[in-house]
């Protein structure tokens, strides 16, 4: 995987009540990632960007909701979410990340 692709795979952290609870309970971090990203690419990107060791990666596709407006029915975009489990003793501090 080339260096340019590493910077494009991770789109940002997912901030929600569920992701905060998972992070505290089982040393996981949740990221929004590119739709065509694989588990291997996500693992390599997290290890390279945050200098941490990744134990495992789980991914899921989030389907966009159907929303109604006064002009008709629209749909939000589908996206991919990755649950990254860090090895024991590792953590990611987003305030200090490079």
Curated annotation (Swiss-Prot):
One cellular component (GO) term of this entry: ribosome
The keyword Secreted appears for this protein: no
Keywords: Ribonucleoprotein, Ribosomal protein, RNA-binding, rRNA-binding
GO molecular function: rRNA binding; structural constituent of ribosome
Entries under Pfam families matching the protein: Ribosomal_L23 (PF00276)
Family in the record: Belongs to the universal ribosomal protein uL23 family.
Self-association state and partner proteins as the record states: Part of the 50S ribosomal subunit. Contacts protein L29, and trigger factor when it is bound to the ribosome.
Function in brief: One of the early assembly proteins it binds 23S rRNA. One of the proteins that surrounds the polypeptide exit tunnel on the outside of the ribosome. Forms the main docking site for trigger factor binding to the ribosome.
Protein name: Large ribosomal subunit protein uL23
Gene assigned in the entry: rplW
């Amino acid at each position: 995987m080339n260096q340019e692709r590493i910077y494009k795979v991770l789109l940002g952290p997912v901030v929600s009540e569920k992701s905060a609870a998972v992070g505290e309970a089982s040393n996981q971090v949740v990221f929004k990632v590119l739709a065509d990203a694989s588990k291997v690419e996500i693992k390599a990107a997290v290890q390279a960007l945050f200098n941490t060791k990744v134990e495992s990666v789980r991914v899921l596709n989030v389907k966009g909701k159907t929303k109604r407006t006064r002009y008709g029915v629209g749909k939000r975009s589908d996206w991919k979410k990755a649950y990254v489990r860090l090895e024991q003793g590792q953590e990611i501090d987003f305030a200090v990340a490079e």
